[in-house]
Amino acid sequence: YDPYPAPERFSDVVKSTGVAIIGQTGNLAPADKRIYGVRDVTATVESIPLITASILGKKLASGLDALVMDVKVGSGAFMPTPEKSRELAKSIANVATQAGTPTTALLTDMSQPLAPCAGNAVEIVETLALLRGERANSRVMQVTRELAVEMLIAGKLVANREEALTKLDKALTSGAAAEVFARMVRELGGPADFMERSDSYLATAPVIQAVYPEQSGIVQRFDTRAVGMSVVELGGGRLRNDASVDHSVGFSDIVEIGDRVDSQRPLAIVHARTEEAAARAAAQLRAAVTLGDAEATADTLLQETFRGEA
């Protein structure tokens, strides 16, 4: 699978399948990287106008007809407070729209992992289950549906929300969504039978263990960023640009806020390269999850929708 296809191939794949999941290119809005370097030494990394410019630079340069953005709020969000997340979402929607690209920004909850997994291969497993219609009521599917509804409306492919939801449900239940994903993988150089035989292609960690809590209780809160950084430490992300990524590691079967855990119900399953790495990740996960006796519910998933003002 080639995540960095030549522009011609990228265009051909989009024309033939309707989608291409690829990495960014340094040739599009190249000044962004240099400007970030200046921000880093001028204490302006947290400047919302400059963050907005950085986020939108490549997107506007690519010539989009419309844009839908997902801006997170909560312990796993890029911005440190709900107020800052809200300010960023509004800024992105307005600036992009005023630059000629009608934009909608959804403010969605990230106070816990969006999916019951975090990593690379484990997230692909979840993705395939979603495409097969096996996670109809999951949090990640709810967010995906809201984003897709906005995209269909922005692209003038449907007249309203009800028509968009009908179209989405049909794509999932008919198998069309899974079929298009499989075709995209094949067109970008991946295996033709990936959907049918994904287990044969996805990396599997040598050490897979359940992570049990030190005491029983109900999940009250997550430090979602800490969960993500634990995956990075396992090798599932990069701390340096030249570092390699271990696609096999991460967490699966992660509990949600409001779930009860004990000696029989683990917090998650850790996938690691070594026993030592698994033990460190397990300790980090326990520290990232707050347990208590009270019933708990997650924050509202879709919190606000910002439509750009011209």
Could you describe each region identified by the protein language model?
Residues 1-62:
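Phosphate/pyrophosphate-binding betaalpha-module
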Residues 17, 44-54, 58-310:
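Well-ordered secondary-structure scaffolds
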